[in-house]
UniProtKB/Swiss-Prot annotation:
Keyword Secreted: no
Protein species of origin: Jasminum nudiflorum
Protein's name according to its UniProt entry: NAD(P)H-quinone oxidoreductase subunit 1, chloroplastic
GO biological process, any: photosynthesis, light reaction
MF (Gene Ontology): NADH dehydrogenase activity; oxidoreductase activity, acting on NAD(P)H, quinone or similar compound as acceptor; quinone binding
Length: 361
């Protein structure tokens, strides 16, 4: 029979307790960046909704939201709270599982894209060597959720909206991917951090906007189509399909689609900033003061986030203004634009970029 000393038993218990606490603290430290990113994304979406309402009101010469909070800034929060308390209705002959899973797939696939977006040199959740292609691969899952929602609703308008969403995504995903390939060739990397660093070598004129102007225009149009924004909102055209794949939804599930559209718009704007506008780099030599960054890591972090978001919201303004400027395309015009114009242009741009890169070796 083995007899243990009391002191040894206490030491073993304290050691096991210490190891358990280390595991708990380790899990907490892993969750902190994720929760911070989710909180930032939520605030970003609320700001986008408020901006769209204010800009739309200004363009239409009317008064925007003004009662929910100062200047109506809490209007999006009020709308979300209202949707939370709405009843969740299910179509009588629809597929309940597909009907429920569809909105979740749309939101989760877009949320995963934020993990590879750098807000600064070290401000990124996961600096992967295939960062831009992870975004393309994950974002291409969202139309599957929309198609599931349309099919599970057992409604002709919903099903047509889901089919349109899938066709539109396939048509514009290819030019988008070819534009990203051109940027990766210029930067010699698929990492989003490396792409931003490659643009910082020559300051403002080193942005890929100037080195890839054709690719920038194609990327801009394709990203608007991927976000299903006007003039590319064919999957939910009110005059034709009531509300498209959202027709049978209510309550929180309808709110998930609402959130997914703005999440997609924000992530597309962030990738325009990262791929073409130099990311977190200010890139203006006369305004760059190195002493500011020597004052501390916190100040440097704030400056990087501010620069990234300023460029992002500039593109968001263009997207919102486009909504009230251009009319909606027909379905045949949308597909012709993607397959007959943007695809050959983006392919030619990729071949030219490859040729120049080979000649410069």
């Amino acid at each position: 029979m083995i007899i243990y000393n009391t002191t040894e038993l206490q030491a073993i218990h304290s050691f096991s307790r210490l190891e358990f606490l280390k595991e708990v603290y380790g899990s907490i430290w892993v969750l902190i960046p994720i929760l911070t990113l989710v909180l930032g994304i939520t605030l970003g979406v609320l700001v986008i909704v408020w901006l769209e309402r204010e800009i739309s009101a200004g363009i239409q010469q009317r008064i925007g939201p003004e009662y929910a909070g100062p200047l109506g800034i809490l209007q999006a929060l009020a709308d979300g709270t209202k949707l939370l308390f709405k009843e969740n209705l299910f179509p009588s002959r629809g597929d309940t599982r597909l009907f429920t899973i569809g909105p979740s797939i749309a939101v989760i696939s877009i949320l995963l894209s934020y993990s590879v977006i750098p807000f600064g040199y070290r401000l990124i959740l996961g600096d992967l060597s295939i960062g831009v292609f992870l975004w393309i691969a994950v974002s291409s899952l969202a139309p599957i959720g929309l198609l599931m929602s349309g099919y599970g609703s057992n409604n002709k308008y919903s099903f047509l909206g889901g089919l349109r969403a899938a066709a539109q995504s396939i048509s514009y995903e290819i030019p988008l991917t070819l534009c990203v390939l051109s940027i990766s060739l210029l930067s010699n990397s698929f990492s989003t951090v490396d792409i931003v660093e490659a643009q910082s070598k020559y300051g403002f004129w080193g942005w890929n906007l100037w080195r890839q102007p054709i690719g920038f225009i194609v990327f801009l149009i394709s990203s608007l189509a991927e976000c299903e924004r006007l003039p590319f909102d064919l999957p939910e055209a009110e005059e034709e399909l009531v509300a498209g794949y959202q027709t049978e939804y209510s309550g929180i599930k309808f709110g998930l689609f609402y959130v997914a559209s703005y999440l997609n718009l924000l992530v597309s704007s962030l990738f325009v900033t990262v791929l073409y506008l130099g990311g977190w780099n200010l890139s203006i030599p006369y305004l760059f003061v190195p002493e500011l960054f020597e004052r501390g890591k916190v100040f440097e972090t704030i400056i990087c986030i501010f620069i990234t978001l300023a460029k992002t919201y500039l593109f968001l303004f263009i997207s919102i203004a486009t909504r009230w400027t251009l009319p909606r395309l027909r379905m045949d015009q949308l597909l012709n634009l993607g397959w007959k114009f943007l695809l050959p242009i983006s392919l030619g741009n990729l071949l030219l970029t490859t040729s120049f890169q080979l000649l410069s070796l």
